[in-house]
Amino acid sequence: CGIHDGASAVLVMEENMALNNGFQPILRFLDSEVSGVLPNYPGESPIPAIQALIKRNQLTIEDIDLIEINEAFSSKIVACTKELSISYSRLNVSGGALTLGHPYGASGSIMITRLFYEVQRRKDIKYVLAAIGSGGGIGVAVLFEVVT
């Protein structure tokens, strides 16, 4: 991975608190998953996290309208799209880490921020998902529902 500078912040609060303080909720956190693969295959680490997350929430990959997967390496995206049958029209639609950078410690909130802005540009979006893998084989996925 290259080394990039960047920062991001995500404001998380109870829906009632947001409304009482003049904020309009956009994304509602539903669930998250942390899974692992053998450390020799870190590019595949988001796959079991995504699979477990959507199964536990009784969804399919087709139910997810927008997906962000951190692409520190292009082979990670190839493996994930092939194994999960993700169409490129729903994946990293605002550009991924190879295009925009991959600042360590900020990538997760950057992906969620991109999803936040993208759901405001589009109609009929119900579920969005972000996932990231680590060099040690750990994959993390998070699922949000769009607040209407």
PLM regions: where:
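Claisen-condensing/thiolase-fold acyl-transfer catalytic domains that form or cleave C-C bonds
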Residues: 1-148
